[in-house]
Amino acid sequence: MEKSFDEELVDIMNKSALALMISIGHRTKLFDIIAELPASTSDDIAAKAGLNERYVREWLGALVTAKIIDYDPSPKLYSI
């Protein structure tokens, strides 16, 4: 089934936002840090990166939604 015009625009916007999140992760070395660490909390990842935990948690949420980062909700651990 073909997407409607508005569905196509929403898809483009979502992919654009994801591209920005990937760029942020690359520029801040968050991907490298997460790959080096065992499954970790957002606090641990932010501390290792020297970044504000709130922003790291928001970034992680976007990447979990895109299924790029894995998340275990019970201990609140993130991993690649």
Model-derived features with residue positions:
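N-terminal accessory segments
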Residues: 1-80
